[in-house]
Amino acid sequence: MAKKSMIERDKKRKFLSAKYSIQRQQLKEQINQSLSLDEKAHLYRKLQSLPRNSAPTRITRRCFVTGRPKAVYRDFGLSRHVLREMAHACLLPGVIKASW
């Protein structure tokens, strides 16, 4: 189980990312459309003044059950440990062991 503080920190990052996403997108569009270097530099400074945790790359995918940040399958939102346990317990419909 992951630390509660790490899970809460990731929730805060998701909230900030959603809050500043429109503003960040508008600034990036203005940067692409601007012609002068001075204007671009000013817009880059405004973009950099946004909170660091509002960037979408700072968000970590975590397991829904354990909060584990590594080895998380996107299709299920579960870590490999929980995925294996749930698949063996037949809690994931349509998932079968591979055999060839």
UniProtKB/Swiss-Prot annotation:
SUPFAM superfamilies given in the database record: Glucocorticoid receptor-like (DNA-binding domain)
Keyword Ribosomal protein: yes
Cystine bridges: none
Primary location recorded for the protein, binned into one broad class: plastid
GO molecular function: rRNA binding; structural constituent of ribosome
Pfam short name (any one): Ribosomal_S14
GO biological process, one term: translation
Entry's localization field: Plastid, Chloroplast
GO cellular component, one term: small ribosomal subunit
Keywords: Chloroplast, Plastid, Ribonucleoprotein, Ribosomal protein, RNA-binding, rRNA-binding
InterPro entries: Ribosomal_uS14 (IPR001209), Ribosomal_uS14_bac/plastid (IPR023036), Ribosomal_uS14_CS (IPR018271)
Quaternary structure, from the entry: Part of the 30S ribosomal subunit.
PANTHER family: 30S RIBOSOMAL PROTEIN S14, SMALL RIBOSOMAL SUBUNIT PROTEIN US14M
Family assignment from sequence similarity: Belongs to the universal ribosomal protein uS14 family.
Function summary: Binds 16S rRNA, required for the assembly of 30S particles.
Protein name: Small ribosomal subunit protein uS14c
Organism: Staurastrum punctulatum (Green alga)
Taxonomic placement: Eukaryota, Viridiplantae, Streptophyta, Zygnematophyceae, Zygnematophycidae
